[in-house]
A protein has these predicted regions:
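Short, hydrophobic beta-strand segments that form beta-sheet elements in well-ordered domains
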Residues: 36-39, 59-64, 104-107
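A conserved mid-protein helix/loop that constitutes part of the nucleotide-sugar donor-binding site
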Residues: 43-51
């Protein structure tokens, strides 16, 4: 309800972003398929995703670190591989551009979730797992706020190890409803003032005195 952190130039950067040029640079041989980014932990459903991509024109962009290691481990036992490539490390703006350029984003943790929400593209969130499975309730609450269609809710549950069924297919009808959901969530966030603006207003309206911290 308090909004999310948003840079003052975020929307301008999005509007000026050359999506076609980015896609040509990072997936120059992409057929008329989906460009998918992968930033995850080690989901048990990863082999499912990779198998689903085999034989399709879709291309998977894998971020470095744990995602790349997980993909390489899964591919070691697969006789046929999907189209994929590894991305180098990048800074925040580069990560944002990847989210804007891709047709579907797999993101992990809270920071990348916020960036995925601002991107307005379909995404599947890998929430940080907790030993007592408290993250399950948090994920369900988020999916309720997102007003996710059944197929997208199932995708999140399977990706986060809450259900064992297969991942929903990346068919056009599924991606279409997921895109509508992501855009609706973005519209709701844009209708709010950014978090910093709301915090400043709260401080001013309640006459809260803020004392600058002293260096130690």
């Amino acid at each position: 309800t308090g909004g999310l952190l948003r840079e003052t130039d975020l929307l301008e950067r999005q509007q000026n972003f050359d999506r076609a040029a980015w896609r040509q640079q990072h997936a120059p041989n992409l057929a008329p398929g989906l460009l998918i980014s992968l930033f995850c932990y080690e989901p048990s459903a990863l082999p499912q995703l990779l198998s689903q991509l085999v034989g399709t024109p879709h291309h998977l962009l894998v971020t470095p670190g744990r995602p790349l290691a997980a993909v390489q481990h899964a591919l070691a036992s697969m006789p046929v591989h999907p189209h994929w490539s590894a991305l180098p490390y990048t800074e925040q703006n580069g990560f944002d551009e990847m989210l804007w350029a891709c047709d579907l984003n797999f993101v992990r943790g809270e920071d990348s979730l916020v960036r995925a929400l601002w991107a307005g593209q379909p995404f599947i969130w890998h929430i940080y797992p907790q030993d007592d499975n408290a993250h399950h309730a948090k994920l369900e609450a988020f999916l309720d706020w997102m007003q996710t269609p059944p197929s997208l809710r199932q995708a999140h549950r399977v990706w986060n190890g809450m259900e064992n069924p297969e991942l929903p297919t990346l068919a056009a009808n599924n991606l279409g409803t997921w895109a509508t959901c992501a855009q609706a969530a973005l519209d709701r966030l844009l209708a709010q003032k950014p978090l910093i603006t709301q915090l400043l207003a709260f401080v001013q309206n309640n006459d809260i005195q803020v004392t600058p911290s002293q260096p130690r």
